[in-house]
Every structure is written in C-alpha cells, then in structure tokens.
From Swiss-Prot:
Matches recorded under Gene3D superfamilies: 3.40.50.2020
Family membership noted in the UniProt record: Belongs to the UPRTase family.
Positions that bind uracil: 195, 200-202
Keywords in alphabetical order: Allosteric enzyme, Glycosyltransferase, GTP-binding, Magnesium, Nucleotide-binding, Transferase
Enzyme class: transferase
Metabolic or biological pathway, per its Swiss-Prot or TrEMBL entry: Pyrimidine metabolism; UMP biosynthesis via salvage pathway; UMP from uracil: step 1/1
Domain of life: Bacteria
Protein's name in the database: Uracil phosphoribosyltransferase
The keyword GTP-binding is annotated on this UniProt entry: yes
Length: 211
C-alpha cells in the first residue's frame, strides 16, 4: 500500500475551514467538493491513457485520452456521496458504482448493506471515496470487495486519515495495488473511534444527523 499526503496551501486552507465547528452544512459540502477536486488531481496522476491522433486548427498532432476500460468511481454511502461530484469533475467519462456500508459504533466493525457496481472489475482502475480513514475497517472491507471482483489498481481518496487506520490498511492490504490519497494524517483516534483533531462526523456535517 502507498500513502500520499497532498501538501498544498489550498488544500490546507480548505481543510482548516472544514475542521472548524462553526462551518455550516452548505459551506461544508461546498468546501468538501472543492477539496476532493484538488485531491483528485493528485489521485489521477497515474490514470491510464492511450495515444490518439488529432488535427488542430493549425496542424495534425498526437495527444492522449483516457483509455478503456473506463475508470470506476465508487463512493461509500452515505458520506462518500458528498465527494462524488468533486471526483467526476475531473473524470467525467468515468463509470460510477456505489457501496453502502455502515460501522457499528460499539464494535467499530463495518458491514455492507447495498452494492451497485459491475461484477467483473478486471483491468479496471477504481477510485473509492470515503471522507474519513479512521479505524480502517470500512475502507479495508470496501477495497477487499473491489479486489475480489478483479480490480487491479485501487486508489482511495479520503479527506482525513488516522495513523491507526493507515496501519490497519498497511497490515490487511499488504501486497495489494492500493494507494491512499489524503489531505492529512492526524494525531490519533479517540476512544469513540473519531479522528483527533479531525472534523467530526463528516456525514452528519454534510447532511445533518440521521436518527
């Protein structure tokens, strides 16, 4: 597994406002969208391309375009849905799948309640979206599902990560073609499994609490 922390002043600026408890939901959603686009720029550095011959208004030339099969973008519901627009803004031709996963707040274990994506992901580059890499359980389970379907190149785009979650990813996904792209690796997890200093519950801050 490879970890890439994006070091950029605009990333740090937007992340600081996201962390601020005074930031309201509409502003949080907008900033998360903008931050994901910045992270997506880094996450797609190795997106697969192929040569194409074109003619400009001046002369013929050779360029590149995204190759087939098209990349697949998979947000983890529900909070990952708030990252989708920011990702497909840079990959408008990507296909989109969905994984519905929920974490038990007592055991911190993840379970899947919904899946909508191709059964065969052989040869596909997949970008999985989840705001927080906290305990690592949800993201590990999601990526294992993608690899089971044949994905050979998975990039996880997360707003924040905790060292404990990174360690779990490195342990459970050792030797797999996985990259994690994030704006920050924070200090630690607290006793409730929240990232410290973090930004709170990303889903609740995007959409309001779900009872």
């Amino acid at each position: 597994m490879r970890l890439h922390v994006v070091d950029h002043p605009l990333v740090a600026h937007k992340l600081t406002t996201l962390r601020d408890q005074r930031t309201d939901s509409p502003t949080f959603r907008r900033l998360a969208d903008e931050l994901v686009t910045l992270l997506a720029y880094e996450a797609t550095r190795d997106v697969r391309t192929e040569q194409v011959d074109i003619v400009t208004p001046v002369a013929p030339t050779t360029g590149v375009r995204l190759s087939h099969p098209r990349p697949l973008v998979v947000p983890i519901l529900r909070a990952g849905l708030g990252m989708l627009d920011g990702m497909v803004r840079l990959l408008p031709t990507a296909e989109v799948g969905f994984l519905g996963m929920v974490r038990d707040e007592e055991t911190l274990q993840a379970s899947t309640y919904a899946t909508r994506m191709p059964d065969d992901l052989s040869g596909r580059q997949v970008y999985v979206l989840d705001p927080m890499l906290a305990t690592g359980g949800t993201l590990v389970a999601a990526i294992q599902e993608l690899i089971k379907r044949g994905a050979d190149d998975v990039t996880a785009v997360v707003l924040l990560a905790a060292p404990e979650g990174v360690e779990i990813m490195e342990r459970d996904l050792a030797g797999t073609p996985v990259t994690v792209v994030t704006a920050s690796v924070d200090e630690r997890l607290n006793e409730h499994g929240y990232i410290v200093p973090g930004l709170g519950d990303a889903g609740d801050r995007m959409y309001g609490a779900a009872e």
